[in-house]
Design a protein with these regions (language model features):
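Membrane-helix interface "capping/anchor" motifs
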Residues: 129-141
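Hydrophobic alpha-helical transmembrane segments
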Residues: 1-126, 144-243
Length: 243
């Protein structure tokens, strides 16, 4: 019988000290979802880089720090030793900062964008705190909140309105995030809940191969790594194209 890796995720560092804070940020996934904001902004007719940068900063605070701090408060899925009061403080300050960026940006540029601030706040709290019995903590809401919404916000922050390209880009974000969720669900299950794996594969030539925990999730984790890199490279290519 083989045991899964002691790490709760493929990007988690060894526990302790500053490494816990790096792991808390989910670096590849944060970069993945910030790329959606960039993609949305680059789909706009003309790119205002300052406003796009502000949108990326807001999502870096809300998703990269705030959402992940709230998630870690619930059951310690990353097994960090960060004190609960510190996680609460990180969540409150980062989410408040993201909201402040949104409010100031909307007042300075396009007042209707204020609507997106409470929507984003609701999505962060409802998903990560599993409000209403976890109704919003589902694959679909993950796709909408972490895939579609960032694209919409990136486009709106730059263009000041919403066009067909924004909604098509949002659909791309939703579908790709759903694919991410399908892959990561199995990986998280094995890494965080399974304590042992026993089995073997019998090939048509009679040869037998041992089935262990690492083999169970190797394909999914390789796909997640490649998808994370793909989205970041796509966002970078779109920035280079629009410069």
């Amino acid at each position: 019988m083989s045991a899964p890796s002691a790490r709760p995720s493929w990007y988690a560092l060894e526990t302790g000290s500053w490494r816990d804070y790096v792991t808390l940020l989910h670096p590849p996934y944060t970069a993945w979802h910030l790329s959606y904001v960039v993609i949305g902004g680059c789909l706009a007719p003309a790119v205002a880089w300052g406003r796009l940068g502000a949108a990326v900063a807001a999502f870096a605070l809300a998703v990269g720090v705030g959402a992940h701090a709230l998630d870690e408060l619930s059951g310690r899925p990353l097994r960090t030793s960060i004190p609960a009061p510190v996680l609460v403080g990180l969540a409150v300050v980062s989410i408040a900062g993201a909201c402040a960026i949104g409010v100031v940006g909307a007042i300075a540029f396009e007042p209707w964008l204020l609507v997106l601030v409470p929507v984003g706040l609701f999505l962060v709290l409802a998903y990560n705190l599993e409000l209403l019995g976890g109704r919003f903590h589902s694959d679909l809401w993950f796709g909408l909140a972490w895939g579609g919404f960032p694209v919409i916000c990136g486009y709106a922050a730059v263009a000041g309105d919403l066009g067909v390209a924004a909604f098509l880009g949002a659909a791309f974000g939703v579908l790709l995030s759903l694919s991410q969720r399908v892959l990561s669900n199995d990986v998280r299950h094995v890494r965080r809940r399974v304590v042992g794996v026993t089995g073997e594969l019998e090939l048509e030539d009679g040869e037998r191969e041992t089935l262990d925990a690492d083999r169970l999730i190797a394909g999914e984790e390789r796909s997640l790594r490649l998808l994370a890199a793909t989205v970041v490279v796509l966002a970078a290519a779109m920035v280079a194209f629009r410069l």
